[in-house]
């Protein structure tokens, strides 16, 4: 085992604080509408330019092991905030730095670190409750756009596109962000349920120009197993022909004679029909077939339930206003399922989302909710160069996460003002002893740090701005760093999601509390320069004559 270096007491804490400061100073320059960019070197390709706090934090690795430990702990703050709220990583980093700085000063002055931490925790609980009380619901699409705009560093176009996408697919809908090949940023919306399976034969195509199959007012047969013969289905097919409605068959596979029979019937014009494979694999396939059944108001023909194709009747089939099939995708629009049943299915899947521990499963379950509840929107981010596209994509991702958070827990005044106003609720809060009271005052002072940083990044004195806002009794009064004006932040459109502000503070206080209570640090001792791995070879002098 390698030898270890151990640092204690003030030496350990000072090293750790240096690492915290290096990382936080690099991240906090990005905060606010006039925050600067950070350029990240990449081992291949062009450097990456970003204003995303967590992207900057993740790149930082320090040479000194003890400083690096401090930096990594603050990196954890940014990562956790990003995972929970999707935005607010820079705010969380600034808060963590402010709490750690003041906390370590108090420890150096002889205060008990554990009591300081208890005071910090007491204050955090109180402020989080105040933020939740101050939050109000997002009232309209314009406010969604404002949240997106603020998070995208003031780019109104991004905020508007996210608001439009959310309006079309609903708050539960899936919105994905991709890179566009062109210069423009575009939004495509797929309403209804879409899955990645196309037609099994090009002979099913009804629109030869677009190479798509379009079925209006269509009935849907859902079968769990493979179809290799249509013989058992003949009575059903005769009823379908009489109904004069197109039929879509979704099964594990349709092959051989069954597929040939369908194609021949389609070409002769006797039957308007198409067949696609069921989406997914294994248990997920069964679940998705059940989703489609609920969406279309039909039943899955499953041998597990004792159903046979021979006994299928028309009332077991689902239906939809429109179904469009390309060679790769099938979209079911306006299924005939009961609204109450669809809502019950969505609630059931949500329960599974809460219980699952796998990120992959959670993502797939969320997709299923979106397909049942709303639809899918894709925002394709464009730009002049690859570097610009990547930088804008970061901002769109942040803005999208912020708008989702706003819809979940409501909005508060932006620009760091919500934290300062919530801090006023700490007046009169006392701990069990003086050291805990100091912990409370550390949080109160730290709550001003994001506001000060936003002001300083805009070239204004942060202390003056913080003082003016502290003195005001109007909870909406704040400083708009974009225009350098004071006034009603809601009227300016400067708003933040309550969830982002709350999460940033909770994560910052949690990690900062751990750093303050650190008394010793252990790290690998660096290897001595020049020593060969095996202790070096003995001198080989005098052997020059060997052949």
UniProtKB/Swiss-Prot annotation:
GO terms for biological process: protein refolding. CDD domains: GroEL. It catalyses: ATP + H2O + a folded polypeptide = ADP + phosphate + an unfolded polypeptide. Keywords: ATP-binding, Chaperone, Cytoplasm, Isomerase, Nucleotide-binding. Gene3D superfamilies: GroEL (3.50.7.10), GroEL-like equatorial domain (1.10.560.10), TCP-1-like chaperonin intermediate domain (3.30.260.10). Its EC number is 5.6.1.7. Forms a cylinder of 14 subunits composed of two heptameric rings stacked back-to-back. Interacts with the co-chaperonin GroES. Together with its co-chaperonin GroES, plays an essential role in assisting protein folding. The GroEL-GroES system forms a nano-cage that allows encapsulation of the non-native substrate proteins and provides a physical environment optimized to promote and accelerate protein folding. This is Chaperonin GroEL 2. It comes from Roseobacter denitrificans (strain ATCC 33942 / OCh 114) (Erythrobacter sp. (strain OCh 114)). The gene is groEL2.
């Amino acid at each position: 085992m390698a030898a270890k270096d151990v640092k204690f007491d003030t030496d350990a804490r000072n090293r750790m604080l240096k690492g915290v400061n290096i990382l936080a100073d690099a991240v906090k320059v990005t905060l606010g509408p006039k925050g600067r960019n950070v350029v990240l070197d990449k081992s291949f390709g062009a450097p990456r330019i970003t204003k995303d706090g967590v992207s900057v934090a993740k790149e930082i690795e320090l040479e000194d092991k003890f400083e690096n430990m401090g930096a990594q702990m603050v990196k954890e703050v940014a990562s956790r905030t990003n995972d929970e709220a999707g935005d607010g990583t820079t705010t969380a980093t600034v808060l963590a730095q402010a709490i750690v700085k003041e906390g370590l000063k108090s420890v150096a002055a002889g205060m008990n670190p554990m009591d300081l931490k208890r005071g910090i925790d007491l204050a955090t609980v109180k402020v989080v409750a105040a933020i939740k009380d101050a939050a109000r619901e997002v009232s309209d699409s314009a406010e969604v756009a404002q949240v997106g705009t603020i998070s995208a560093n003031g780019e109104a176009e991004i905020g508007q596109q996210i608001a439009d996408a959310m309006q079309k697919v609903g708050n539960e809908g899936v919105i994905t962000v991709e890179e566009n090949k062109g210069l423009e940023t575009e939004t495509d919306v797929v309403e209804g349920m879409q899955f990645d399976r196309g037609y099994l034969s090009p002979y099913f195509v009804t629109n030869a120009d677009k190479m798509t199959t379009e079925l209006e007012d269509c009935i849907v047969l859902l079968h769990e197993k493979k179809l290799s013969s249509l013989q058992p289905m003949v009575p059903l097919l005769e009823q379908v022909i009489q109904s004069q409605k197109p039929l879509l068959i979704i099964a594990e596979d349709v092959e051989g004679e069954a597929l040939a029979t369908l194609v021949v019937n389609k070409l002769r014009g006797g039957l308007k029909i198409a067949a696609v494979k069921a989406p997914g694999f294994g248990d997920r396939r069964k679940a998705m077939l059940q989703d489609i059944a609920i969406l279309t108001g039909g039943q899955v023909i499953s041998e597990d339930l004792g159903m046979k194709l021979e006994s299928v009747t028309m009332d077991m089939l689902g239906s939809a206003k429109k179904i469009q099939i390309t060679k790769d995708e099938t979209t079911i629009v306006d299924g005939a399922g009961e609204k109450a049943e669809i809502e019950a299915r969505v609630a059931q899947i949500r329960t599974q989302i809460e219980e699952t521990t796998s990120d992959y499963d959670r993502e797939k379950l969320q997709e299923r909710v979106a397909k049942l509840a709303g639809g899918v929107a894709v925002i394709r981010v464009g730009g002049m160069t690859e570097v610009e596209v990547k930088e804008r994509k970061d901002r769109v991702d942040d803005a999208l996460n912020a708008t989702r958070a706003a819809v979940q827990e409501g909005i508060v005044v932006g620009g760091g003002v919500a934290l300062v106003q919530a801090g006023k609720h700490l007046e009169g809060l006392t701990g069990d002893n003086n050291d805990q009271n100091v912990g409370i005052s550390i949080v109160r002072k730290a709550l001003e740090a994001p506001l000060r940083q936003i002001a300083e990044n805009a070239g204004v004195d942060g202390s003056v701005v913080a003082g003016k806002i502290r003195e005001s009794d109007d909870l909406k009064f704040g400083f708009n760093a974009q225009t350098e004006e004071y006034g009603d932040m809601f009227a300016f459109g400067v708003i933040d999601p309550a969830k982002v502000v709350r999460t940033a503070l909770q994560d910052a206080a949690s990690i900062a509390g751990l750093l303050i209570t650190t008394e010793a640090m252990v790290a690998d001792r660096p290897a001595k320069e020049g020593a060969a791995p095996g202790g070096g070879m003995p001198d080989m002098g005098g052997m020059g004559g060997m052949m």
